[in-house]
Amino acid sequence: MIRILFVCTGNIFRSRFAEEDFNHLCKTKNVNATAFSAGLQVGKYRQRKMYKPALIELKRLEIIPSRSDEDSIHINDIDINIYDQIICMDGQEHKPMVDSNQFLSSYAIQYWDIVDMPKVSSQISLPKCYKKVDELVKQLH
């Protein structure tokens, strides 16, 4: 089984959406892969559950999230050695955070370009994220 880790800043919006989307698509397309998600700076956020715009978009896509009520998780609190691929949602935002985290220095990390709110509306960023996740699932199929 292939394991993917999606990473964003607070683990409440982009990475959680990507995780739920990926797992749903893999299940419906019978792809032997699974995803989880974590954040690089979860302590900066008071709201620590999945962000409402992500839940709304998942509902629109008829995806029932499996972890919507779970708190966000910091990347240093999980064993990232079990993942075959680590994807940070926005290279411009996350590369400096990764570079400053000694825990992550030895890992090959891929960077996407899914920009966070308020710079980019969720109505733009989440469909873009869905497309990137769909492309990834197709590559694994």
Regions found by a protein language model. Name each.
Residues L40, G91, I114:
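Active-site loop/turn elements of alpha/beta-hydrolase fold enzymes
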Residues H94-H141:
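Phosphate-binding/catalytic loops
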Residues I12, G91-H94:
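Short glycine-rich anion-binding loops that position phosphate/pyrophosphate groups of nucleotides
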Residues I80:
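A conserved, positively charged/aromatic
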Residues Y83:
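An anion/phosphate-binding loop that grips the pyrophosphate of nucleotide cofactors and donors
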Residues M1-D77:
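Conserved active-site segments centered on acidic
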